[in-house]
Amino acid sequence: MGRLDGKVIVLTAAAQGIGRAAALAFAKEGAKVIATDINDSKLQELDKYPGIHTRVLDVTKKKQIDQFANDIERLDVLFNVAGFVHHGTILDCEETDWDFSMNLNVRSMYLMIKAFLPKMMAQKSGNIINMSSVASSIKGVVNRCVYSTTKAAVIGLTKSVAADFIQQGIRCNCVCPGTVDTPSLQERIQARPNPEEALSDFLKRQKTGRFATAEEVALLCVYLASDESAYITGNPVIIDGGWSL
């Protein structure tokens, strides 16, 4: 018996990084996973794994999300992962950067939750997990102005949904990682003028001396998706190797 046997789980940004690791971990524990991403070619790599079904989805497009929600008969867990990390202070953040980050990191979760929550309410049960970050209202981080702002908003959204719908059988939590070794992180390091120095800077702030792995974060997500965490709601759950201490 898997820890997620019989559960239907929808997640976004499943083609790589934490989303991919979570999709695989959910399926391994017996869930029926509907993995979505905008990147069709990378997403298709998940089709070979038992228990995982894929669907191309742009989480910034309301029409696509509403159609997707209409196609899903039942849903136990919604895991909102999609997001973007902008590098810079407020002076480096143009209005286009601000709008893009808000749209992908916050509005997409609003759209997904609003589309799928009525289905959960009709079932009188549901579990929503949002991807936030330690770089948020939890910790001020250099050069993460708009990113931290969006992730603080995710914590606020999470607490609001949890408070509003707890009596309807709905739980809502968010995962707050520190620095995780993902393709996104490696791309950001390589984009810096001195990648070697950037890597060193990232590692220096890790009290454990290493990054988290996507698989470690995925194991926390399995716990939050399972009935083992049934008494947990409205919480930003930190997994950061002590970075926020």
From Swiss-Prot:
Key words of the record: Cytoplasm, Lipid metabolism, NAD, Oxidoreductase
Classification via CDD domains: DHRS6_like_SDR_c
EC number: 1.1.1.-, 1.1.1.30, 1.1.1.104
Name the UniProt record assigns to this protein: Dehydrogenase/reductase SDR family member 6
Family membership: Belongs to the short-chain dehydrogenases/reductases (SDR) family.
Molecular function as annotated in GO: 3-hydroxybutyrate dehydrogenase activity; 4-oxoproline reductase activity; oxidoreductase activity, acting on the CH-CH group of donors, NAD or NADP as acceptor
PANTHER family assigned to the protein according to its UniProt record, in alphabetical order: DEHYDROGENASE_REDUCTASE SDR FAMILY MEMBER 6 (PTHR43477:SF4), DIHYDROANTICAPSIN 7-DEHYDROGENASE (PTHR43477)
Subunit comment: Homotetramer.
GO cellular component: cytoplasm
Organism of derivation: Bos taurus (Bovine)
GO terms under biological process: heme metabolic process; lipid metabolic process; siderophore biosynthetic process
Catalytic reaction list: cis-4-hydroxy-L-proline + NAD(+) = 4-oxo-L-proline + NADH + H(+); (R)-3-hydroxybutanoate + NAD(+) = acetoacetate + NADH + H(+)
